[in-house]
C-alpha cells in the first residue's frame, strides 16, 4: 500500500514538472490554438471572445481556415469601400422607412 501511494505521489509531481503542456487551450470553437505568436502560415484573430486572454492570439492553421471564412479573412479598409457601405446603408434605411406597416382593423 505504501508503494502505491509513493508511486501516485511521484506521478503527481512529474505531471507538474513536464515542460510541455498536456492541455492545449483551443479557441474559435476548437479550430484555433491560443499562442503568443502565430506561425507565418497561420491566421491570427484578436477578438475578446476568442478566450485566449490579453497576452495570446487565436491562431488558426491554414488547413482549418476554410471552416470559418468569415473570421479568418484579412480585410483591407479603403475609402471607396467605406463610402460604398455608407451609401448601401442609406439606401437600405430609406427603403425600410417606405415600408411602414399599415394599420389593420380587428373587425376585418
UniProtKB/Swiss-Prot annotation:
Residues 1-20 form the signal peptide. This is Beta-defensin 126. The keyword Secreted applies. It comes from Pan troglodytes. O-glycosylated; glycans contain alpha(2,3)-linked sialic acids. Disulfide bonds join 27-58, 34-52, 38-59. Homodimer or homooligomer; disulfide-linked. Residues 21-63 are annotated as: In vitro binds to LPS, mediates antimicrobial activity and inhibits LPS-mediated inflammation. Keywords: Antibiotic, Antimicrobial, Cleavage on pair of basic residues, Defensin, Disulfide bond, Fertilization, Secreted, Signal. One of its GO terms (cellular component) is extracellular region. The gene is DEFB126. One of its GO terms (biological process) is single fertilization.
Amino acid at each position: 500500500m505504501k508503494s502505491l501511494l509513493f508511486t501516485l505521489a511521484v506521478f503527481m509531481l512529474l505531471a507538474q514538472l513536464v515542460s510541455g503542456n498536456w492541455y492545449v487551450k483551443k479557441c474559435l470553437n476548437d479550430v484555433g490554438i491560443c499562442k503568443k505568436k502565430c506561425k507565418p502560415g497561420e491566421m491570427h484573430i484578436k477578438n475578446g471572445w476568442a478566450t485566449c486572454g490579453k497576452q495570446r492570439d487565436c491562431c488558426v492553421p491554414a488547413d482549418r481556415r476554410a471552416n470559418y471564412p468569415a473570421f479568418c479573412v484579412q480585410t483591407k479598409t479603403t475609402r471607396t469601400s467605406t463610402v460604398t457601405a455608407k451609401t448601401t446603408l442609406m439606401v437600405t434605411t430609406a427603403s425600410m422607412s417606405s415600408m411602414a406597416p399599415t394599420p389593420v382593423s380587428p373587425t376585418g
